């Protein structure tokens, strides 16, 4: 009877963690390449969302904005209330500019530093859709757009192959299901999600990954102890 109670309690704890605290995430596709790759397994936390929205640079899990059964994984680029512009040039490099207030000819905003975007892909980034414009929800490329309150502008790191706010529009805060903080598969890439900062999310992820790291060390010691001594 005691074993049954323990099993039920453990199952209830796991359910509560998945429902309100953390969730596993399977990366499908290459829209977040090179930082995240196809079939990577991640841990996303939900706790920080109860105390406010995500921060710029966070990798978020969002509800599919189109007919799809799978969640989307994107990076937060623009925050609620900000002005954003993706500036094309002769090389089609989509530099992103952000401003807290309505930009003028004298205040052109600040260009974002995006180290998570691969230099190889950055040289080929299209500013918008194939037709040279944003979706009907947003004006043409190179124009400033105002992000409504409680909405976010999200994009994939692999800008050439990502369906994101450039095509489906702003992402409401209510559609954000979690913040990806750590990768636990493959094991040789175990660690924090690229671009993540030391925040509450990282502390939570570190605590989650600690048993896995200990298991890897223990297995390494076990394998080394099985080796035969070198001949003298």
Label for each model-derived stretch:
Residues 3-6, 11, 17-26, 32-232:
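Soluble "head" domains of membrane/secretory-pathway proteins
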């Amino acid at each position: 009877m005691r074993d049954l109670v323990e099993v039920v309690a453990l199952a209830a704890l796991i359910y509560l963690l998945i429902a309100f605290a953390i969730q596993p995430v399977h990366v499908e596709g290459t829209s977040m390449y090179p930082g995240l790759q196809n079939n990577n397994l991640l841990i996303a936390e939900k706790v920080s969302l109860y105390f406010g929205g995500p921060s710029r640079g966070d990798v978020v899990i969002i509800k599919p904005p189109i007919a799809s059964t799978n969640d989307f994984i994107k990076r937060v680029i623009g925050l609620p209330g900000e002005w954003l512009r993706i500036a094309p040039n002769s090389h089609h490099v989509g530099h992103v500019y952000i401003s807290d207030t309505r930009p003028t000819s004298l205040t052109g905003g600040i260009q974002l530093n995006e180290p998570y975007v691969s230099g190889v892909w950055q040289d080929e980034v299209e500013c918008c859709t194939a037709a040279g414009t944003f979706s009907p929800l947003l004006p043409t490329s190179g124009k400033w757009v105002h992000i409504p309150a409680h909405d976010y502008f999200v994009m994939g790191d692999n800008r050439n192959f990502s369906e994101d706010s450039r095509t489906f529009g702003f992402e409401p805060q209510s559609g954000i299901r979690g913040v990806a903080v750590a990768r636990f598969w493959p094991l040789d890439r175990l660690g924090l999600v690229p671009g993540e900062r030391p925040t509450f999310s990282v502390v939570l992820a570190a605590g989650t990954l600690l048993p896995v790291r200990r298991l890897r060390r223990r297995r390494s010691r076990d394998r080394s102890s099985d080796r035969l001594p070198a001949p003298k």
